[in-house]
């Protein structure tokens, strides 16, 4: 068994699962995030919501969760490095009380594949996972709105995968986010310092950034305005994914409309995971996003209701 693999008996003095996210606005997405991950953890007490600035609506939505309110810096000084340092420090502390700490953005949802063992017992599955480093990566799936067959607006109160089924496997969202041990300083949410990439195709990270065209446009414009303010202030925010989002949304929708989108099967997930881990090892820990997106796929019928 490799270093860091699970012992035969989990430490029951610690709870099994905690989930962590950071949020500013986007209340519909947060409500869904809390509902979904609270069910996975078995209690809202295991959800740790970091609000970037005081927001009464977030406080109301997150009742029963652990809440931290951080001061909002309108200049965005060192935004991303400070955010990553906060996450890593919080993970290190929470691992004293939980066996697994999962860090996700508010538009990211951990889902156990319904055709595999973790769907029946996620905590037990993670306890017994043969982990090669400090964190496990679920397989990222970028859920994209396909208006030709999904014409309606997304209803956040209904099952998401009953309304949106199409998208791309993507290495950028195959993030090392399920922590069993504290990460070292110097990495980020997509790559951990001096750590292997270990993608588990039995676990999926469904990314909802582009799951609804209208919602995606609204959030994209808000984020672009925020980055423009940060740039004007010269705060060195180092945010690399918030600009030009409208163009990326339009391109993702065009690409998914042009794809035949066969059903996504376990063999496809395994093949993609192995390929991305090989590329990561070959390129000495670099995440190759330009070579990290699959063709379009459709989530099979058994995924309806998973989120």
Regions found by a protein language model. Give the residues of each.
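Residues that flank catalytic or metal-binding motifs in active/ligand-binding sites
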Residues: 15, 105, 199-201
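Short internal beta-strands
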Residues: 48-51
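Short acidic, S/G/P-rich loop/turn micro-motifs used as interaction or catalytic elements
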Residues: 26-27, 108-111
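Conserved acidic residues
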Residues: 45, 99, 107, 134, ...
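Active-site-proximal specificity loops/subdomain of glycosyltransferases
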Residues: 55-104, 112
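Short, acidic, metal-binding catalytic loop of nucleotide-sugar glycosyltransferases
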Residues: 35-45
